[in-house]
Amino acid sequence: MLSSLGCLLLCGSITLALGNAQKLPKGKRPNLKVHINTTSDSILLKFLRPSPNVKLEGLLLGYGSNVSPNQYFPLPAEGKFTEAIVDAEPKYLIVVRPAPPPSQKKSCSGKTRSRKPLQLVVGTLTPSSVFLSWGFLINPHHDWTLPSHCPNDRFYTIRYREKDKEKKWIFQICPATETIVENLKPNTVYEFGVKDNVEGGIWSKIFNHKTVVGSKKVNGKIQSTYDQDHTVPAYVPRKLIPITIIKQVIQNVTHKDSAKSPEKAPLGGVILVHLIIPGLNETTVKLPASLMFEISDALKTQLAKNETLALPAESKTPEVEKISARPTTVTPETVPRSTKPTTSSALDVSETTLASSEKPWIVPTAKISEDSKVLQPQTATYDVFSSPTTSDEPEISDSYTATSDRILDSIPPKTSRTLEQPRATLAPSETPFVPQKLEIFTSPEMQPTTPAPQQTTSIPSTPKRRPRPKPPRTKPERTTSAGTITPKISKSPEPTWTTPAPGKTQFISLKPKIPLSPEVTHTKPAPKQTPRAPPKPKTSPRPRIPQTQPVPKVPQRVTAKPKTSPSPEVSYTTPAPKDVLLPHKPYPEVSQSEPAPLETRGIPFIPMISPSPSQEELQTTLEETDQSTQEPFTTKIPRTTELAKTTQAPHRFYTTVRPRTSDKPHIRPGVKQAPRPSGADRNVSVDSTHPTKKPGTRRPPLPPRPTHPRRKPLPPNNVTGKPGSAGIISSGPITTPPLRSTPRPTGTPLERIETDIKQPTVPASGEELENITDFSSSPTRETDPLGKPRFKGPHVRYIQKPDNSPCSITDSVKRFPKEEATEGNATSPPQNPPTNLTVVTVEGCPSFVILDWEKPLNDTVTEYEVISRENGSFSGKNKSIQMTNQTFSTVENLKPNTSYEFQVKPKNPLGEGPVSNTVAFSTESADPRVSEPVSAGRDAIWTERPFNSDSYSECKGKQYVKRTWYKKFVGVQLCNSLRYKIYLSDSLTGKFYNIGDQRGHGEDHCQFVDSFLDGRTGQQLTSDQLPIKEGYFRAVRQEPVQFGEIGGHTQINYVQWYECGTTIPGKW
């Protein structure tokens, strides 16, 4: 341990000079001084800047024996927190250097650079892994930071395969110019290629490379699917390195009306890199210690005279409850306002700062690729109204914690426990973009102390939806009319919301006639300036205002004329208020969109309970029912994270939805069904109408839903992708207990009839049902991981899944509430066919689909026969028939890249009815990250065979066994084809035992079913809550299992089920 730390220090100090030397243009190259200090459990490197005007940037680069593909860890910006998984022994380089001054006019060079193939170099690391490096097509001396400024431009696609024209290429995405490719076969020739991830990118010439011969494998050693022996120690504990930038100097950028003044230099300060290694002094390191890098910049908030106040991101701990990330407030330049805010981009753009006026200015980077780090484009908000009336006071968003930035903040600190979660959730609320002239004055967003002089109109738009939005920094825009009043905001770094602007919550009621009372702004509505905005609200797509805005902000709700009243969204005002909130189009994230009880129509939502200031902005935000999306009450519930759940409500909400007869509205992907509120998550009493989603409208991809924090030390790591992606707490939905195994088509050539009376999954193992309404008629990506176009059609609905979460049938089925079986005396067989047969598929999950349909009208149906057939197969072959009494059914164990046809036939005791229309669907390619495409002879053959196992399992279905090369038998018992309990045994006839995990909850046990991904498991209890049993256990992948006591005092955990992304038995 000490040696690796010493190496870290040495490398860090050496690379400082290297980092400087190579990146600066010829001429003067300033050096950086570093102060190194060591205490009992931490190493502190304090990098001193040559001058106060210099900002620093850097990254952590790892090399070592068993390096993961994500060996490039860029340090997060602006107080953000990220986690990465690293090996304990390898060496890491810390590279820090002065950042080049940003060029306001520099655009991503990817669009203009010539299309030339990259130069690829491949080197050997171990018998099963190689190191790839390729050349930039531009001069890295001047473009070193470009990858972080052009997230969609600086990614590369690597492809490789065994040298054989018949083999399929395996693809990986990489954010850096080098990566490690692992899990290769020893002594085998592979072909490698790389290309820039931009339109028209050209593949490099094929590079042939032969892996080296591996040494003999050690008996009983458990490895990845390949059986070669890695030249690494059998036991390599991994450590989690949380990387946090604690405080970063914020840059104030002020734009004067038309002329841009040079950006103000940030105050000087030091950046601290803390390497905290808790296990350093422990004699035995049982749990991997975590290294924490925190880079903090002296908190120097400067109140840019009356214009911009830079608010340092505060909060050193990952929980960062209130970081006001850096709102660099830009004084808006008056921009001509055009009424149509391009809504389309507004949504995606991550930082679009919607100048409240019509033209939301969208930052180019907006497109944020999934978890791309949105680079906080500075959203310069422009003054929205030309009308001088509004005084420009710079909205000092300061205190308002740049809500845009940290969406995270908004969540009550408590929820912020998984940092990422919170942020994703809140952001969505959209900022009401007020159409045309509507001068909305928002009360100065919250200036804490001053009630906000004059109304400032800024709506920070913070857009939205990125999975872990890097805090977009929205600069609150201030309307620039003359006379800028600079409210004196108290500079306290964190928003004190103490008197949230008293109020001016002005709602712009479009038809001024009924001013709504301010949405709950805590303080009294204040003079409701309801300026009346011209009625045409319709263009108001307004980007979503992050809810985090301190409420006062204005709940501007344009109660525009009812015309679009898209969702009941809380329209409080009787005149069909269309809460701006839900612009029709932007489909604000409105989580759940059922905005709070519509009933409180005339009254502002006050129920919201204006949170006490201490409630962290979160509440305030919530408060803003402005975004009524947040169900108001949620503020009280710490669990808000779920609440906010960015599940984007469907694009447009139509209030007219007809509630389903079943007790819960059945949310049907197909046409207009109301998303059903799942009682568990939302406190909000939903009013009778639920917004419905229109089938055809295409919704922007929704950010992954936050999930409860998982495994102690580490999140799934095997995903190739942007740096830091591993740190995103996988945002997959929380799984609920298994749904009774739904029979799947089996591989036998004959027809099999299986009844699959589905039982609703009930919350078990601590899981909670969520109100999930994320069906979309189009996939978020047009192609699957291997580049094949995804199947689209009027009868197909997509559900987005985070890339690093395993596929889950149980979670997907939660979107379909159970309906009570029809009771009634049938007088004749059903006369009408089921209608609206829809195929619901989860992106990245080719092994199953969920069929959903409407029951025949005026017929008594007691069960349905679901017929699934592989296209091109003759009658009776590859055909499956399932029986269910629900109006949906899961078809499992489908083959990748295969076309299927589905039909549904209604039945009752008197006979069968006419069959529904036939719908077709083609599954996507298999995910190469889940398991290796095995060649003939190496397949693990799962044999259905009962075995004697421990009863600690939620899965009660069929049992399968397979023999593995490491001389153990693996047994699984199914909940469904993607959720099962895994056991190990020394003999086929002996007892099969639970598998314990010394440092997690069995996430890496997916290796036993040949999955490369870390899976999801449940029920995750601490060992002292588990009975002591005998079983196998280990701490990390690749380590041989041991046999002994698990549970109880042993600190070894075991679980009731696993979801690994691999289907069992895997054949149809």
From Swiss-Prot:
Residues 315-351, 384-811 are annotated as: Disordered. SUPFAM superfamilies: Fibronectin type III (SSF49265). Coiled coil: none annotated. It is found in: Secreted. Residues 463-473 have a biased composition (Basic residues). Glycans are attached at N37. GO terms for biological process: extracellular matrix organization; positive regulation of cell-substrate adhesion. It is linked to Defects in ABI3BP has been found in a patient with isolated coloboma, a defect of the eye characterized by the absence of ocular structures due to abnormal morphogenesis of the optic cup and stalk, and the fusion of the fetal fissure (optic fissure). Isolated colobomas may be associated with an abnormally small eye (microphthalmia) or small cornea. This is Target of Nesh-SH3. It comes from Homo sapiens. The gene is ABI3BP.
